[in-house]
Amino acid sequence: MAVSAPLRSLEEEVTCSICLDYLRDPVTIDCGHVFCRSCTSDIRPISGNRPVCPLCKKPFKKENIRPVWQLASLVENIERLKVDNGRQPGELAREPQDMKLCERHQEKLHYYCEDDGKLLCVMCRESREHRPHTAVLVEKAALPHREKILNHLNTLRRDRDKIQGFQAKGEADILAALTKLQEQRQYIVAEFKQGHQFLKKREQHLLDQLATLEQLLTEGREKFKTRGVSELDRLTLVISELEGKARQPAAELMQDVCTTQDTKDFANKYPRKKFWIGKAIPHMVKRKAGEFSDKLLSLQRGLRQFQGKLLRDLEYKTVSVTLDPQSASGYLHLSEDWKCVTYTGQYQSDCLLPQQFDCEPGVLGSKGFTWGKVYWEVELEREGWSEDEEEGEEEEEGEEEEEDEEVGYGDGYEDWETDEEDESLGEEEEEEEEEEEEVQESCMVGVAKDSVKRKGDLSLRPEDGVWALRLSPSGIWANTSPEAQLFPVLRPRRVGIALDYEGGTVTFTNAESQELIYTFTTTFTRRLVPFLWLKWPGARLLLRP
């Protein structure tokens, strides 16, 4: 039958540490420890001195030994309880299976030898090997270790609490971040949905206006056609009659002449009447069509600005780039911070480096890119180069167009001078010659492979490893084969260059208005660097930021 824990604890209290049996005639010594009376008589003095307690090693006097009657009574009661629990009187309770005993004596390990660091039983403690050593009770020896364990345990518990706190806070932060991302997702969907609806309404509004213009033009076309057919029929009839008169014999013709009232002017019988068919496109319709074209230009500019701004702000990282002076042509002068380049017009380099442009006035950036999305700007400084002048030119052109609308319509007898046509053609040829001269003054901005060819006359096109725009007084051109004119009158002060290496695109924008100008699309396999080319006296290019 299993022994209850309280009973086993009581048995340990009434067990003699010397004989390891129940206390028989228990007595106490000076230090307070209790032993059997017969066991105390076996304790011998050490080196002729007084005997010492086997447990605490304190000396005691045998004349001070006193009986402990209460323990004797307690032993008797425990023995009776043992009988009730199915054990014979004097039989001790079994120790827990996991409790270690002395391997030599099979006794309890009550002591700890501080010299050898071993657990001892009573018999080992009294042996010659350990008698001169310092031995203390296991409970006492365990106290400092237990205290260290408890202190370390408290530290670990605090660490656990901190980790749990950090984990809880981290989970809360992650949850808050996920919640914020979800809110941002909903915001993006809602904003784009609203934007789609707005653009859809604007699209429908423009299409409705376009349909109205188409209807007006269709109706005007029918009226114009009807009036023209009627007038043509009248003239055809008169022409046919006169052709018949012209073919008459002379006598018959003169007979008809004599029958008229005015014999001197037979043609007055067929007077030349002024006709009016009307304008093919009424002035009101032309005005509305012009206003609609202006709206489309505003739409185009607005969409370019929108695309350029999103491209720059949402996808690309703005980087600071500088120029590589060793690659600069002798026609160019670089500032001390390698951010600005000026065209000198005269070759000034004393020695030609292998990586230097010789014939072409070009220069490369010192920083290259083999991945990522990066953005930088190039500013063009030159007197007379601005978008304000562009707007002024557009206004002048608009006024000229309005004047053209007022002129060019009259009656059916309006004459056209061929000399004026020849004169205008001559003016156009002169303008083309002037444009060809202006093309010589230009600059290019973009990117190039770091291995781009730098010697001799170069085309500097995508097939040569250069993706650039050319800016000139005649407008902006994509440096492709063949060269493509993009905007004849666009004059941006700053050009934004957005490079998406993995995406294989180089996008150019008006950095001030965020308008999209042009995008090159290809596959990049080499390191790319900024590229500038300047052949424009009085102009300079600056890298921003």
Curated annotation (Swiss-Prot):
Residues in coiled coil: 197-243
Classification via PANTHER family: E3 UBIQUITIN-PROTEIN LIGASE TRIM
Phenotypic consequence of gene deletion: TRIM26 attenuatess the production of proinflammatory cytokines in response to TLR ligands, TNF-alpha, and IL-1beta stimulation. In addition, the challenge of TRIM26-deletion mice with LPS results in inflammatory responses that are less lethal than those in wild-type mice.
Description of post-translational modifications: Autoubiquitinates upon viral infection. In turn, autoubiquitinated TRIM26 recruits NEMO and bridges TBK1-NEMO interaction.
Name the record gives this protein: Tripartite motif-containing protein 26
B30.2/SPRY domain ranges (all copies): 301-545
Zinc in keyword set: yes
Keywords, alphabetical: Coiled coil, Cytoplasm, Immunity, Innate immunity, Metal-binding, Nucleus, Transferase, Ubl conjugation, Zinc, Zinc-finger
Comp. bias regions, Acidic residues: 386-440
Organism: Mus musculus
